[in-house]
């Protein structure tokens, strides 16, 4: 269950963060999960908060499409609290992680 994933590193090349990261086009292509095949034998869900920045929502959608996975957009959650479900053993996120849906 990728949570708020950054799955395509190419957009980072055009940010000031890349002064530190130093990602080039070849590395962005090779290291971006969206360009890799999905893990085999897993029922995947890509989790993202509905109140996240548009880039995170798009990246989650992009990965879900590329991997043929379900995208879960959790209402009322943002990038820093979308992981709250990890603390609740009965949460939909934990059920997805355990394959219980």
Where are each of the predicted segments found?
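Alpha/beta-hydrolase superfamily serine-hydrolase fold, recognizing
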Residues: 1-101
């Amino acid at each position: 269950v990728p949570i708020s994933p950054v799955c395509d590193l190419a957009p980072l090349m055009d940010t000031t963060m890349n002064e530190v990261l130093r990602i080039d086009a070849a590395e962005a292509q090779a290291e971006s999960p969206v360009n890799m095949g999905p893990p085999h034998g897993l029922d995947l869900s890509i989790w993202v908060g509905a109140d996240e920045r548009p880039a995170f929502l798009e990246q989650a959608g992009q990965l879900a499409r590329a991997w043929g996975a379900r995208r879960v957009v959790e209402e009322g959650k943002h990038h820093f609290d979308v992981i709250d479900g990890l603390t609740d053993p009965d949460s939909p996120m934990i059920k997805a992680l355990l394959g219980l849906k």
